[in-house]
Regions:
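N-terminal nucleotide-binding beta1-loop-alpha1 segment
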Residues: 4-8, 22-30, 75-103
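Generic amphipathic alpha-helical segments used as scaffolds and interaction surfaces in large
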Residues: 19, 23, 136, 315, ...
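Short secondary-structure junctions and interdomain/linker hinges
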Residues: 26, 39, 43, 131, ...
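Domain-scale recognition of functional cores that engage charged ligands
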Residues: 63-89, 101-329, 333
């Protein structure tokens, strides 16, 4: 038995049961840790190769402003698709439940006695009712949030917005030599491997097949903590009129923004995550970035695109560890994609994420104002 296999076999039964319940892939794990140990995976291996250019002005499609005739046309197109049963929503409600004092973010109260998840689901449900349709809604959980979010989902389901959960997978953090990280108590450190799990987890759960059988053709993805990314029929209309497999909302960058951005790689327009840009590339040459709100044709999630695993550094109790993640936006490297430029703030604002309690306190007034304007509060 190899040392690696021996390490896994030595895990306690409770940990092994949790890993198995949430789809831990032992073979992939062993391959990745071997690649890390042998130097085949790591920081410099994450960098893109080939020609890399900022997007041109013509690469971005601007969402028309509210009250314009063009926006109204897109809204009608989106509502027609909702009414026809073609649209479902997926809200990312996973993660590690560490930034709000151990409380699952979806269950944190934001405004008017309502939580992040309440407000997300109320928005989707109201949009479904206005369109005269039904929007099946999925919540992607993690091992850390699944129990709590599933309880909330069961209580929140309605005929116009039935709610169901499925979970992303789980893995173990490593040290640079590929060995399993353990803290001072000797405990291993589990993590959820990012939103890149979406295509695989939604298929593995059977939820994607259920959507297809129900006649759904497009899936609207957003983060539970970005309440400005409301379920807007005009965005759906823009996706349909763009006639691309994927639509990604992008917004103007502000100081401190981190994440992916639109770029052309060997001529192909796609989203590139920040850590994938070579150090020689000036990321400030790209004025927009990915807001993590996307629309997919179901075929995009059914495709067999091979998404890469990336070694990402994290700090756990002061120790530097490695975890492997996939990126859902890497699908844009394989499939035709529309970059939809949306407003960040103001009446049309669509990007107000909340990562921790301090950010919630500072952003709450602006979030409440926006939600009132959109009649969600």
């Amino acid at each position: 038995m190899s040392q690696n296999s021996s390490e896994l076999s030595s895990l306690d039964p409770t940990t092994m049961e949790l890993l198995e319940r949430y789809g831990f892939d032992r073979g992939t794990f062993e391959t990745l840790r071997r690649g890390l140990r042998d130097g085949e995976l790591g920081d410099t291996k994450n960098y893109l190769q080939g020609s890399l250019e900022p997007p041109s002005v013509n690469d971005l499609v601007r969402l028309p402003p509210t009250a314009s005739a063009e926006r109204s046309e897109l809204t009608l197109l989106g509502q027609q698709a909702i009414r026809g049963g073609e649209i479902a929503a997926v809200v990312l409600a996973g993660g590690m439940a560490t930034r709000f004092g151990g409380v699952v973010k979806a269950a944190v109260e934001v405004a008017g006695g309502r939580t992040f998840l309440d407000l997300k689901l109320d928005d989707i449900g109201a949009s479904a009712v206005r369109a005269g349709g039904r929007v099946p809604t999925l919540l992607m959980t993690s091992f850390a949030t699944d129990r709590e979010v599933s309880k909330l989902a069961f209580a929140a389901t309605t005929s116009a917005r039935p709610v169901k959960t499925f979970s992303q997978s789980v893995s173990l953090r490593l040290l640079r030599d590929g060995s399993i990280y353990r803290d001072q108590r000797g405990d291993v450190s589990l993590y959820a491997p990012g939103h890149g799990d979406l295509p695989f987890a939604i298929r593995r759960s059977g939820c994607l097949a259920e959507l297809r059988q129900a006649g759904v053709r497009h899936l609207y993805m957003s983060n539970v903590d970005n309440l400005a990314a409301t379920f807007d029929p005009a965005i759906i209309g823009a996706h349909l009129s763009g006639n691309k497999a994927i639509t990604v909302e992008v917004a103007d960058k502000a100081r401190g923004d981190k994440g992916g951005a639109p770029a052309r790689v060997n001529g192909v327009l796609q989203i590139v995550e920040g850590f994938r840009f070579p150090t020689s590339f000036d990321q400030d040459s790209i004025p927009t970035f990915n807001t993590n709100t996307l629309l997919f044709d179901l075929e995009a999630l059914e495709s067999n695109c091979s998404l890469n695993w990336f070694a990402v550094k994290k700090k756990v109790d002061g120790a530097e560890v490695i975890q492997f993640e996939r990126l859902v936006h890497e699908l844009t490297a394989f499939l035709p994609t529309q970059m939809l430029a949306v407003s960040r703030e103001g009446v049309d604002g669509r990007f107000m994420p909340v990562k921790d309690l301090d950010e919630l306190m500072s952003r709450r007034p602006a979030i409440e104002q926006l939600l009132r304007q959109r009649k969600i509060l």
